[in-house]
Amino acid sequence: MNKIIYLTLLLSCFSSFAQITGKITDTNKKPLSFVSVYLDKSITGTTSNDSGNYELTIKKTGEYIIVFQFLGYKTVKKNISVKSFPYTLNVSLEDEEIRLDEFSIKTKENPANMIIRNAIDNKNNNTDKFKEYTSNFYSRGLFKVKNAPEKILGRSLGDLGGGLDTTRTGIIYLSETVSEITFQKRPRRFKEKILASKVSGSDNGISFNRAQEVNFDFYNNAVLIAENNLVSPIADEAFSFYTFKLEGSFYDKNAKLISKVKVTPKQVGGRVFSGYIYIVEDDWAIYGIDLFTNGKQVGIPIINELRFKQNYNYSAINNALIKISQTIDFKFGLFGFNVNGRFSAGYSNYNFKPNFTKQTFTKEVLAFTEGATKKDTDFWNQLRPVPLTKEELKDYKTKDSIKMVRESKPYLDSINKIQNKVNFLSPILGYTYQNSFKKWSLSFDGLIEDFSFNTVQGFHSSLGVSYFKRQNDKGKWWSAGLDVAYGLSDKKARPTFYYSRKWNNISKPRFYLSGGITTAQFNGRNPIKKLDNLIRSLTRRLNYIKIYEKEFVRIGYSEEIRNGVYFSSSLEYANRKPLFNTTNYSFARQSRNDPYTSNNPLEPDNFTSSVFTEHKIATLNVGATFIFGQNYLSYPDRKFNVSESKLPSLNVNYRKTFGADNSEFNADLITASLKQDVKAGNYGEFFYHFRGGMFLKNKNIAFMDNLQVKGNQMFVVTDDNRRNNFGLLEYYRFYTNNRYTEAHFEHNFNGYLLRKIPLINKLNFHLVTGIKGLFMWDKKPYYEYSIGMDNIGFGKWRVLRVDYVKSNFNGVKIDGFLFGLTF
């Protein structure tokens, strides 16, 4: 073992000096970043950093030909004789001479169209040349801010991890990742194993630099960016979205003719790119990418610009052009907080004949090797293919020092001392006392948190206290709390308590126990928000919410028992009591508005009797959710599930009510739901949701135990789950103790249709259409049809949606407009 360690150290020391180093500039002595540097006849090597410096590691002294390649500049080959290390080689690159040859000028057809058409026709042939491979991947992420504000919306930003200087300028995020990636074209699969990961100023070392997240393939018809599909310049339907112009051509190091084609969108604001694509003549493969887009086009308005650059190199092994480097530069800003960033990536050590087995690709698409986030500085100095700039090196050193200080007990205590100060708003807004070093906190819920109004309790709120203890950094914690709600009109206090525990972040097993006295909506799916009911009651005398009281104790447990299979269960014993209106208060005059209705959901004019009688009952729920095809990321001590499945998710639940005072209330119910978001490429996104239920025996059960749907009687919809709700259906009109099915379909075109209409396309609105249906065994079918506009707003503020909805029930048709916020 000692010999192995010694040999490893010896090789590491040798390799640290086996380097060719230097600086790359243009003819004006300006540093060139991300220039590809490699040995002739090889595919990959290294790249230069933002200062133009590079380090190329070779195994021994001797004669070498070093290639310097950068899009827009002439490729340079340097013959050198290396007799000792380190060897210094500085290089100056000249601008590429782009020229139009005579044939291109004389031809009647737009030569760029011919080039793009050939590139489209040869996509499959070119990508089949690297349909399977493994490679090494290195990435670096960098966020920089200039003149950052001290506060946003009244909240202090602090020093953002210690990266800001006195002008509040500096690096706020710096990370590096080294990994092995495995790729297969058919069926399309991708796998990554993290060998080393580092984040400046962080202990866990977990970065955002996933290879799959930046695997932007312009051979595909659609390039997925932030869950939005942008049309590739060589997509099958590219000519419907772009015009092309041949800027000129040049010869590469292999005497291949490279055409530089300008890409211009036909419609402004669509899911498109602008810039240049470089195509190799005869092969019709991509030689390089220099394309940009903006936040409006990718659906993230705060992004000002997003630029992609990709460099390719020829591989003689498979006679193909292979991506060897990529940069993604971006700018975004909000509330005066402006950030410039770059994610750079390099690919090396390609193997185009891997030996894949059935075990190669699983649902685990990312994993960390042991100790990947704990590598020390010496390790990174040996492994890092692209040298750090002076600014980056300083950031690592500064934040590592700051991190040690900020994890110490004196520092954490001093921060808590400031955070734990009580002010005059604490009773209203809430207050938390923290002990960060011992990892616990004590919180007080302010009066405003649960403040609301209904005609049973009147104005009501609650006071609560809770304790939270984090037991380790692997997701183990426990929490307990006590809450007392009080209504000013019914003058009744309702105390509740809870205890909850979680053991880890892998399967996320969670246990909870709760009990006390509370109020609940008759529809257990809670279709009415407290805030909505407060506003409508006080301004229009529309008291939609109907509630009952229950004294209860509940115990529950949930866990992901295997990947994509989530188990949940609960057992409750409750005494349910009817409640009645105790107040007629409203800001709205009764003479100008309809009077309040009773708390009886079926008889709005019955103020003296309820829809049910007081009773005791036990309720058992056992359910499972199946997310088919779920991929996941295995981070150290935690598992992240990826919601990118092309398959639907299924939820099945069994509910048994038993032990009731009235045996008719005892019943067995099975419910199931199936839903999916279907990405339709450039045509938008399609959503469907089916939900149904069936009682095993038809009985005269308590009203709140009936199958019910989520209706809506508000013209302003604040429910972010609107796709699963009906838009014009009265809250308590449809219920059953037998069986029912509901279906929801919605298609958001994401601008696909509207961007084809002149002037309208400048608004960047999204057309949305939908249809919903409800089918209950004892009622006629109910239907809703809708058409609307999403993404309404201006600039970076696009949070409004408007729908026109029309319903049809037994020949009776109702219509109306719904306004909603889509944060």
What feature does the model see in each segment?
Residues Q19-L32:
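Structural motif
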Residues L39-K41, E63, V67-K77:
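A short, solvent-exposed loop/turn motif at the edges and junctions
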Residues E97-I98, S104-I258, T264-V272, F335-S452, ...:
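Structured extracytoplasmic
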Residues T127-F130, A255, N423-L425, L429-L442, ...:
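Short loop/turn motifs that connect adjacent beta-strands in outer-membrane beta-barrel proteins
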Residues V263, L291-G295, W440-F453, K469, ...:
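Transmembrane beta-strand segments that form the barrel wall of outer-membrane beta-barrel proteins
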Residues S42-N53:
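Short, acidic Ser/Thr/Gly-rich low-complexity loop/linker segments typical of extracellular
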Residues L306, Q457-S461, K491-P495, E549-V553, ...:
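Residues that define the transmembrane beta-barrel architecture of outer-membrane proteins
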Residues R510-L531, I535-Y548, S609-S610, V642, ...:
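C-terminal outer-membrane beta-barrel translocator/porin domains of Gram-negative envelope proteins
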